[in-house]
Amino acid sequence: MRYTRIVFLCCVSCLISLNSYAQGKQLKKAETAYERLEFHKAMKCYKRAYSKSNDRAQKIQMSFLMAECARRIGNYRQAESYYKRTIKMRYDDPIAILYLGMMQRNLGKYEDAIKSFELYMQKVPEDIRAQEAIVACEFATDWVNNPTRYAVFNMKGMNSKFDDRMASFSNKDNTQLFFTTARKGVTGRKISAQTGQYYTDIWVTELEKIKKKKGKGKQPKPKWTEPISLGEFFDFDDLVNTKYDEGAVSLSERGDLMYFNRAVMKKNEFHSPRIYSTIKKAGEWQTPEEISLSVDSNYMVIYSSLSPDQTKLYFVSDMPGGYGNFDIWVSNYDKKSDAWGDPINMGPEVNTDAMEISPYMHKDGTLFFASNGHIGMGGFDIFRSVMRSDGQYGKVKNMKYPINSSYDDFGIIFSGKDVMNGFLTSNRKGGRGGDDIYEVKLSDLKFAMEGVLVDDETGQPIQGVSINLEGSDGAS
């Protein structure tokens, strides 16, 4: 009996040691992944370590870090759940309450969000972020109840269950779209430790060509074709897409010059993403080259956007000298030296102490961009700003609902000289999965008119007459 008891105790001791070792190993993996910004991988490792841990203080910290990972990868519903659990476990830093409110706002739960922000204000009254967030929730509620004339439609045939984002017109008549995708079939077959999806490629879709019907009947509406890879579309060896991330495309109006982002792996480590350019010759895209900007290689250079006249390159960077985490910068092209000049910050009217991304310069000189620092509905909202007479950009204006939602909305572009039709990216509720591309349309104004048609001479009403009204643009 004594021998059996000793064996049993030894087995239990071994199991406890093995469990502690496994938990410690997972925790170390999670910490390493978190430091490398591999949030999807870190969250999985934290989950495993959490399930094996018996240390309450350690579990509380891991619960908070799991919430942080979910927030960083845009999984707001999961982040909300983890923040709630962390607060219930009596996490001692009230920042968890602020972040819970942010996740509730991102999910459109504005009343719950306001309660969380009010609770945070009681604990940290000197932090103005909660008060600003309450104001934003009130604005958002009003915007949802009073939508603008824009209508937004999910491009279901273009999107996949993976991330699809950042559409860019690639020819003069706006019948081709380049966009970023993480769908099956991309060049790289590995899963990104940061996002949990495939590494992204640049793919293409175009409006199908339809023969017009004779007569005055309703013409069929052309549809966007099934997206295919860049190499397959142009039928050439793809020199643009690699096994790692490419995306955030910007093209010249003629569609023969392309700027895009590329992530480069060196010695098993990703280096800060840079902007590359390539030109199209004889229908084929040439070997891309990194463009030279005066930005230290330790900092990111992303979301490039070429101005319509090709003299300015707008981009986003976390380099020093800005106002927040990521700012919008611009570089002017110098013809004499055939090079881009030193980056110039877009200033405090545009940039905040948070993040600004996806700049887009319209033909009329309006700058469109996304921000989570200006007052918005939640996540990233799309804003616009017009250049003043002094050359600086003026007060930014929120594009409101339904262009914006409580989720992340960014990457807007417009076709033609107006701002009536275009595309944007959003991970809003109701999409196919992750980021989706949406079509944007400005609805026509509708008027209700009534009156009586009378004879000029007699003043008597005229019966049985149909009236046709024609506008200055020929519309009737």
Regions found by a protein language model. Give the residues of each.
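Canonical positions in the second alpha-helix
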Residues: 49, 85-86, 119-120
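Short coil turns that delineate tetratricopeptide repeat
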Residues: 54-57, 91, 125
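TPR alpha-solenoid repeat register
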Residues: 59-62, 96, 130
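Short, conserved micro-motifs composed of acidic
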Residues: 76, 99, 106-452, 456-475
